[in-house]
Amino acid sequence: MVDAGGRSAAEGWRRMEAPPEGADLVPLDRYDAARAKIAANLQWICAKAYGLDNIPEDLRDPFYIDQYEQEHIKPPVIKLLLSSELYCRVCSLILKGDQAATLQGHQSVIQALSRKGIYVMESDDTPVTDADLSQAPIKMSGHMAMVDALMMAYTVEMISIEKVVASVKRFSTFSASKELPYDLEDAMVFWINKVNLKMREITEKEVKLKQQPLESPAHQKPGLEHAVMHCMLEPVDFARVVRYRREHLSARQSPYFPLLEDLMRDGSDGAALLAVVHYYCPEQMKLDDICLKEVPSMADSLYNIRLLREFSNEHLNKCFYLTLEDMLYAPLVLKPNVMVFIAELFWWFENVKPDFVQPRDIQELKDAKTVLQQKSSRPPVPISNATKRSFLGSPAAMSPADLPPSTQPLTEGSHRYHLHSEEPECLGKGASTFSPSHPLLPLRQKQQKVSQAEEIPDQRHRSNSLTRADGQPRGAAIAWPDKKNRPVSQPTSFALHHAASCDVDPSSGDSISLARSISKDSLASNIIHLTPQNQPHPSAGKTNGKSLLSNVNIEDDEEEELVAIIRTDVSPHSPEIPRTSPQAPGLVASIRSPQRQADTLESKPDSFYLEPLMPAVLRPAKEKQIITKEDERGEGRPRTIMAKRPSEGSQPLVRKKVTGSHGSRDLNRTFTPIPCSEFAASIDPTEVGPQSTEATGEGQPLALGRFDPVPQGQVADGFFLHVGRAEEDEGRWYVGSQSPSSHDSEPWTILRQDSDSDVVDVEDAEQDFIGEDHPVVIPRYAGEEESAKLQEDMKVKEHEDKDDASGRSSPCLSTTSQLSSMSMASGSVKMTSFAERKLQRLNSCETKSSTSSSQKTTPDASESCPAPLTTWRQKREQSPSRHSKDPASLLASELVQLHMQLEEKRRAIEAQKKKMEALSARQRLKLGKAAFLHVVKKGKADGAPQPLRPEHFTKEFTQHNGEDLDDGTCKTEGFLVKEEQRDLSDSQDVAFVQLHKPRDPATLHDGEKHRVISAALLEDSVGEVDVNECDLSIEKLNETISTLQQAILKISQQQEQLLMKSPTVPTSGTKNNCQDQKVKAPVHFVEPLSPTGVPGHRKPPRLGQGRNSRSGRPAELKVPKDRQQGCSRSKTPTPSVETLPHSRSLPPSTHPRSPLDPGGELPEKCLFDSYRLHDESNHRTFGLSSCKDANIVSEQMNFKEGLDTSVQEAELSSSAITGKEHTPMEEPLRSKASLIEVDLSDLKAPDEDGEVVGHESSLELGGESDQKPGVGFFFKDEQKAEDELAKKRAAFLLKQQRKAEEARARKQQLEAEVELKRDEARRKAEEDRLRKEEEKARRELIKQEYLRRKQQQALEEQGLGKPKSKPKKPRPKSVHREESCSDSGTKCSSTPDNLSQTHSGSSLSLASAATTEPESVHSGGTPSHRVESLEALPILSRNPSRSTDRDWETASAASSLASVAEYTGPKLFKEPSSKSNKPIIHNAISHCCLAGKVNEPHKNSILEELEKCDANHYIILFRDAGCQFRALYCYQPDTEEIYKLTGTGPKSITKKMIDKLYKYSSDRKQFNLIPAKTMSVSVDALTIHNHLWQPKRPTVPKKTQTRK
């Protein structure tokens, strides 16, 4: 390394190795921080005062050791400090010229600093004074504080937050809302971290570029190769860095650029600062010279500190004023010293910018990349499997080779944020590809920081830059800071994540937040930009049978939200080819195994790769996945299963390859149990449908969710309440169009599900069943009703979720929502906001009330954000890192806009809902009546039916769904659970007992179709339900009732047990919840809640929401507190439930449903079943799909508000149970009759199943019990059930409407009250203002009157005035009055109007008004030092005339303020008193000047002369300030003549002779000095200059008049 001066690095190294520092390093136990502080401060101030090279010898070392081996500060140093010379010198360098010249003494320096906002304070916050600094013996603490203040002043001059932000903007990006520094220290950390992140990015890019040719695991050793290459290519002096280079060669993969969290603690090794130096001065400070280790040793730290000091000495004017120990041990007392050094660095690099300062630019990387790209004209080669494997093994090791630059042009349709469009490839080594300069997610940095802290507890967590998690090891390139590394093999075209998520370090919260932002933030839209719709659809056919999933890599890290990477190319092998399938919009939720993903990644280096890098995604056992061989091969309806994410933690590691991770298609990608929402967030809904179809190869939509992906060609603008595909005639809402075309026709039709609740429930359920279904793929099967129905269901579900989660939508977009959000993002709708809102909602949802309200508030949100996203977001939110980095918080403005848009949509939706609700309510009433009659008849005829048997349910499911229910027991158990739950909760909420049974994908799809149809028909057919169906429903209901009764008895006894068993129950509970959600009525959905410990689960909130949905239905979305509480309670027990949904892949032991879980289909089946139940119940309850058409339209309105809560809950459970219930839509219409709504509180028969139900109900109802009696849905005769459900639904809707109206009324009342208060306050304010104005006007009139009279008197004086002004009688009166006024202390106060304002001063003499005794002079007292200006007095100041001396004259009619008061008050009318001060002079002579027996003769003679004279104004002459009477003079204001009347003194007094003027205060009987130099009528006495007195001249008795 050769510095600017030409000295070699070796020389510097030798110099640094000089014995003093190297050998004499003070060990920590002997290091004296206090001494070090004194030495550092003194060295700094001396260097600044004299210049480092000109410091006097005796000051260079401030310490000396005496004969007793005691160390002391040298006397010259102490003398300098006490003299303030050093301080003045240094301070003058900071101040401007004029100010600097005035610096004399410590006080002036302290004041100068305080003017700059810097206060000299000791450590105990006591201010340092001049006395402290001048104190002898010296008080070092005060002087250290002074030096610290000067250092801070220097620091402020050299660096500021604005300068730092401006500097960082040039090479990086940051989140203004989250990362803006709040003080100078934070600004320094911010700057250093940003530079280090930039260096990470640069070095990672360099390494990738160098290693790009390597596709073998060898690329994992870039550090070694780099070091070798560097050493070979660069003629660097080896001597300096032999040791370090050796380390490079031996073990170093890449330099680790640390990120600081604490300036002193984290910066003490010098690595971060050296990285900054290298960034700005790459030639002077070689990167290889710096020891950049993640965990540097002390030797490394010393090496770095020496290097830093050497650089400072050589290039920065020796600004490093610390010792090695100071920097190494970094005691807090030295923080000001370190800060001033960093400020100086910043100043040199950003302000001075010497020639050697040449910041590294990314351009060099770009150039290198260009070269590399030119090298290979062919599109980037897909990453080899070996490379992928190696990458999977250690993502960090991934080399650029693995991530070939995406030469593939972005599809025109893909509007990606190319943070670095030119740098799409993931940076191996955990280098985050996003350059700080490219804002991925502005807010992510902080979030990343949090997530990093969580994720990488062992790492030093430094504030993350946008690009990467601070604490993340550079070696790991993780797109998402999931705890798992994900392969970054695929460079994502998605510039948003900038080079595939691999950019981000494994711990990089940025990546995570990016993914999050995708789901939550408008960034999602960016991702979506790449959606097929946006991107050109090269070929309609699916590419390589890969569905969008190939483009979208979704992985759910336990905490990581979905990491959906949308690839531009569908074809794994032709990355350069944009997704060919026009259906690309269809998202295949199928999950690829990591290998699959890797292949896909390889194939699509350019495609978006948001999926978090995971070490190797564990493939859940196939047995646990609901994946058929067909699905795996992509032949079946691979329902893009969002591998349901473990309930936020219940089974975080379980990843389902929903679609058969092992399949050859991308769909097989291992799917981390990403909540549907997560999955959706990453997946573009538009891509989902068509793509999934492609992926399937059959064009069948993966059962991802009933998302009807937006038509391939069109971008899903967002979820639309409009029944895109819904056949309103049938009263069914098609969330997804049944056919691809329908999908196209309706971009995301109503997804009723509460984003949040659905997200949670649906996430779980769908993740299990639909996991992929709902969110991921609603691929449209070109004519498949199933897919359409599923999509419809999903949409309905999402609508409900929206209602519930609309508020929550932002927290988690349901998968569909996420997809849609992504698509919407691309399209225009910002799902991000939904996701964010959903997240917020979940958080509040956890508070529950917020969930329902928020969602209701934003129906669109739910649509746009199905529950899965919510879950995903919730997880993130719950995890601190997530929260901090949540993109939601990131784009505040964007969110605000989204919120506004959502609000508008919500209003429109609510209006529509109201209409639909009215229709559905009427329909329900009719159906309810019919059902009731049927039930009554049936009940009489049949008597109490026997408890439903699992087989019975199964049959019903089969019948209704037209599908075989694999687990009838599941239903029954779920039903029983519901019953028990009802009993336990005594909640009136309808719980859907039907459990989803695992089904074959086809079956599920069919079931979904049927369900959709049945649900859709339910509403329509509810009225048309055959009597037979009603009878069947009634029979079932009766059986259910008996069962429930039995169950209730057991439940009462086993509540505790049930709660403990709840984990098993939860699944059914979840299903029930889903059903409940759909029920929408008091239906409280028992959604499996994540264990209390599972923060990620939103379900509990949803439950609350579900219950509250109706309540919350009003835009207020307020969840009844009891419900919220109940939700919370249910949450707690629900954890097991929620866990179950998540653990759909959990062993059967968990739940009756669990048996299904092993196959992974059970959840789906259960979901379907529950969905069927929903559909069946929806016939009456919330067939989300069917009810949604008629009911949903109206209910969506209501539900979104009411159901939003209840649906959120229900959907939480139902989505968990039904996997978004939409998935179950396959069930035949028959299912509608299979459910019967039963008041859980009515059922009392304990039953084995009842226990199960009880468990679930205890979970579910635990929250509900407070809310409402639980109503359970049981499979009964479809007709009867429908009737019951219709009635209950109608009643529930009416109840919700009433509640909403009441809430609105309350709200309006509150608003009216608030408005009244405001009006009252405004009125009072107006009255006060008017009163003040009137007072002002009155005063002005008085003043004008006074001036007029004054003028008139002046005229009279000139002419006739004297005789009138002379009257003695008025004069005495005025005197008396004045005296009385002054005595009262409120002379002028006597005049209420004018004096009221002036009285403050009028009561006192002008001087006395100040009430400063010192100023006032008693006749015999000592002169007062304080001068009160009359003008300062209120009266005088108030009078505009005051500006002239005349003012004094006017006021001087009475020399005291009393006299002034006279003018303002009634005394104004006494012209004599106003123009003559004779009474005042009379009083002064009598009571002050010549008081007492001794002076009586003299006094009498003086008074006689006074009475004889006709003059208006008199002046007393004093000898001096002692106020010793000498003579009485007459004063003519017109001529300003003062001539002697009697006494000893000059015959006349001129202006020049006057020394001081006094005014007499009659009340205080003393003279007060007037701060004026000119005579006026207000003056009562004066003194002349001392030299005018002749000592010989005899004087009047010289008895000093003491001031009274």
Curated annotation (Swiss-Prot):
Segments of this protein annotated with the region Disordered: 394-413, 444-491, 642-671, 784-824, 842-888, 1085-1163, 1246-1271, 1298-1448
Biased composition range(s): Basic residues: 1363-1374
UniProt xrefs under InterPro entries: CAMSAP, CAMSAP-like_CH_dom, CAMSAP_CC1, CH_dom, CH_dom_sf, CKK_dom_sf, CKK_domain, PRC_barrel-like_sf
Pfam name, any one: CAMSAP_CKK
Subunit and partners: Interacts with spectrin via SPTBN1; the interaction is direct. Interacts with calmodulin; calcium-dependent it prevents interaction with spectrin.
Family per record: Belongs to the CAMSAP1 family.
Protein name, per record: Calmodulin-regulated spectrin-associated protein 1
Organism: Rattus norvegicus (Rat)
